Amino acid sequence: MAELSDQEMLRYNRQIILRGFDFDGQEALKDSRVLIVGLGGLGCAASQYLASAGVGNLTLLDFDTVSLSNLQRQTLHSDATVGQPKVESARDALTRINPHIAITPVNALLDDAELAALIAEHDLVLDCTDNVAVRNQLNAGCFAAKVPLVSGAAIRMEGQITVFTYQDGEPCYRCLSRLFGENALTCVEAGVMAPLIGVIGSLQAMEAIKMLAGYGKPASGKIVMYDAMTCQFREMKLMRNPGCEVCGQ
């Protein structure tokens, strides 16, 4: 396991002193490789906390460029980076947040085989996309490689998060998407409040850190929903669908 430098020990001191986390947890983060898919609102929010917390290797995957309408909620981008690939804009911002980590941008739209190969190189994947087809593609790749997937979504004033560990008897994302169909609304059509994105992205980062460090209990086997209008959280148990084409028997 990678050892922390003196600078890193000072930088991450407030995490290292947490009971049950300690140096082992911080070194586990430094050793970890996380793939973040989508560098829009959720990806920006989640990645900056993974970077600042000391996750040692981040791969950023997106094929989009920064536009002016993104800046309301995509906090790593700026007026100066409008027109740039999102992964490059995000890489530069994250490097300023933490120069001690390695960041690899991948500005591409990958096919199933390419995505599966990339997933297999990582310890955990964050789904920060807004497209059900891409989410299903990610789920299939993560299930095949048994790489945990932390999935988040946010629209209007509502958000949700789920962790898929792919353990025996656990559901997968396809079990969830089968319940709601393929035609999910996007922020372009329905709108979204900026801080809601930060709440859900931060929850994704927290769940990722817990999984990577073996710290706490992940939000697996359930959907955690947040209603920003009333500031209320609720949970719904998510069962594995025996007829699921990905994880079903």
From Swiss-Prot:
Q: Which Gene3D superfamilies match?
A: NAD(P)-binding Rossmann-like Domain
Pathway(s) it belongs to: Cofactor biosynthesis; molybdopterin biosynthesis
Please list the coiled coil stretches. none
Parts of the chain that traverse the membrane: none
Q: Which reaction does it catalyse?
A: [molybdopterin-synthase sulfur-carrier protein]-C-terminal Gly-Gly + ATP + H(+) = [molybdopterin-synthase sulfur-carrier protein]-C-terminal Gly-Gly-AMP + diphosphate
Query: Which GO biological process entries does UniProt record here?
Result: Mo-molybdopterin cofactor biosynthetic process
Q: Give the cofactor note.
A: Binds 1 zinc ion per subunit.
Effect on the protein of changing residue 244 to A: No zinc bound and almost no enzyme activity
Q: What is its EC number?
A: 2.7.7.80
Positions contributing to Zn(2+) binding: 172, 175, 244, 247
Q: Which CDD domains does its entry note?
A: ThiF_MoeB_HesA_family (cd00757)
Gene Ontology MF terms in the entry: ATP binding; metal ion binding; molybdopterin-synthase adenylyltransferase activity; nucleotidyltransferase activity; protein homodimerization activity; sulfotransferase activity; thiosulfate-cyanide sulfurtransferase activity; ubiquitin-like modifier activating enzyme activity
Q: What InterPro entries has UniProt attached to this entry?
A: Mopterin_Synthase_Sase_MoeB (IPR012730), ThiF/MoeB/HesA (IPR045886), ThiF_NAD_FAD-bd (IPR000594), Ubiquitin-activating_enz (IPR035985)
Q: Spell out the subunit comment.
A: Homodimer. Forms a stable heterotetrameric complex of 2 MoeB and 2 MoaD during adenylation of MoaD.
What does the record give as the function of this protein? Catalyzes the adenylation by ATP of the carboxyl group of the C-terminal glycine of sulfur carrier protein MoaD.
The protein here is known as Molybdopterin-synthase adenylyltransferase
Report the source organism: Escherichia coli (strain K12)
Native organism taxonomy: Bacteria, Pseudomonadati, Pseudomonadota, Gammaproteobacteria, Enterobacterales
